Amino acid sequence: MPKYLINFVQQYASFRIHELESVARLFNIDIQYNKEDLEFIESLDPEIETPFLYVTVNSEEDIKKICTRSVLIKSVYSIWAETQLLDEILNELHSKFDKQFLSNYMINKTFKIEVESYGSKYNQKEKLEMMQKLKDSPLWDSGKCLMHPTEEQMDKHILWYILTDFGVERQGLVKDFTLLPRKVYFGQRIAKGNRDDIIKYNLSDRKYLGTTSMDPELSLVSANMGLVKKGHFVLDPFVGTGSFILVASHFGAQTVGCDIDIKAMRKEEDCNLETNFKDHGLTSQFLGTILCDNSCPPWRVNSMFDSIITDPPYGIRAGARKIGFKENRKFVPVPEGLRRDHIPQCIDYSVPDVMADLLELAAKTLIVGGRLVYWLPTTPDYKETDLPRHPCLRLITASCLQILTNRWGRRLVTMEKIIEYNDSIHNKSLLVQEDLGQFDPQHKDLRAVVFWKKMGTNEKTKKKEQKKKSVENHLKSKNNNDVINNNSNDTNSNNNCNNENNIENQK
């Protein structure tokens, strides 16, 4: 089985392996790698983190298929030599390959050499010096250098790469030449990752946009985690401006969205959620949107969706709401003639309830083997018991973490339906806490975590009391000043009257 080196993009380290495995499963590709390398690939510690991972697949076509979908893969290489010093590359190359093989390899082919580094930057002069160190190899005896090949010439064009891995923690010391790279690789590029779709679905190019529109890169990753492909039926129950179903339609799925807020789905008559589908030529994949409440969804208990992909509201930019009557309002029946256009009252919808209802919806409507992919808000105090659970769903991963601030972030949670839903057994009203999860979850009152300073409860209460006392003292002081001023004015008025009377008497 051939072995290849994957160079991942630098951000979203904790997403890399999970997206890779999901895409491999999507194409039914057997992919293997050293499990011990996961510590370095997924790490958020700059001292050990690296974007390079060796994988083994059955054929070159398999790795190329993976690259057509993965957005976190930058490039894939077939490595010919690997050392710690660039000067040793030639020795390594000549020890592994016969001289005659190297001489004949480039017959009737063109080539170009590139230099790429992780944790360092090279100027053009330094890159040329590095390339010159490889000039004595017989590999270049029969090939022809071509800097800008045409599309017709790409079939016989080889891109050779010199890759250096210094690591992030060494970045400030590299130019002093005080440290050696952790690794130096030399090989040819086999394929590029699917990074072009990020540009294609760039938020700034969309006519219909909102404050909660998901970043296109993370939307594409979410679709990959949901195993979306042509012919699938995909639902977003909190659709908003439709970022997830837009990229799901791009991959060939039939999509539908739901939301309780009609204004989120329809901005204007000529600018709405469907506008983005029209601009990308995807209207045939878009089935429409439904105005509904996810706490009482309109769907039957029927396995019909292949994937549910969503970003539920959690009260930071947009609060969650559901249909209900507020405590201070009485129930007033809607007249028969007004029911069609009636907009019902809404009340707050707690984040744990949002998550519990979402999993209930997935258990009822996903096919067995279908995936639920959603974003869960989290804090540094996250624990595994924060996760919502359901007997019909199996957790695939919840370790994909996007850190937004030092107080909170969000996790991409992926679950898979494993058994059919039975209302007499699996209805959430019949389940116990152990089945549903969310034991005192950190996302229960996320706004308090995000918008309050990190202080104890007693300190918060004390600060509130001090502020209240300060306001009361200010008002009391103001009232006293008003009384003194009024008394002073009355005294002056009386004195003026007495003076006027004295003058009259003298006259």
From Swiss-Prot:
EC number, UniProt record: 2.1.1.214
Positions with biased composition (Basic and acidic residues): 459-475
Reactions accelerated catalytically: guanosine(10) in tRNA + S-adenosyl-L-methionine = N(2)-methylguanosine(10) in tRNA + S-adenosyl-L-homocysteine + H(+)
InterPro entries per UniProt: DNA_methylase_N6_adenine_CS, SAM-dependent_MTases_sf, tRNA_mtfrase_TRM11
Keyword Transferase applies: yes
GO MF entries: methyltransferase activity; tRNA (guanine(10)-N2)-methyltransferase activity; tRNA binding
Tree of life domain: Eukaryota
Subcellular location: Cytoplasm
Main location, first listed in the record: cytoplasm
Record's GO cellular component terms: cytoplasm; tRNA (m2G10) methyltransferase complex
UniProt biased composition (Low complexity): 480-507
Region ranges (Disordered): 459-507
Keyword terms: Cytoplasm, Methyltransferase, RNA-binding, S-adenosyl-L-methionine, Transferase, tRNA processing, tRNA-binding
Cysteine disulfide links: none
GO BP terms: methylation; tRNA processing
Entry's family note: Belongs to the class I-like SAM-binding methyltransferase superfamily. TRM11 methyltransferase family.
Function: Catalytic subunit of the TRMT11-TRM112 methyltransferase complex, that specifically mediates the S-adenosyl-L-methionine-dependent N(2)-methylation of guanosine nucleotide at position 10 (m2G10) in tRNAs. This is one of the major tRNA (guanine-N(2))-methyltransferases.
Complexes and interactors: Part of the heterodimeric TRMT11-TRM112 methyltransferase complex; this complex forms an active tRNA methyltransferase, where TRMT112 acts as an activator of the catalytic subunit TRMT11.
PANTHER family assigned to the protein according to its UniProt record, in alphabetical order: RNA METHYLASE-RELATED (PTHR13370), TRNA (GUANINE(10)-N2)-METHYLTRANSFERASE HOMOLOG (PTHR13370:SF3)
Name by which UniProt lists this protein: tRNA (guanine(10)-N(2))-methyltransferase TRMT11
Gene: trmt11
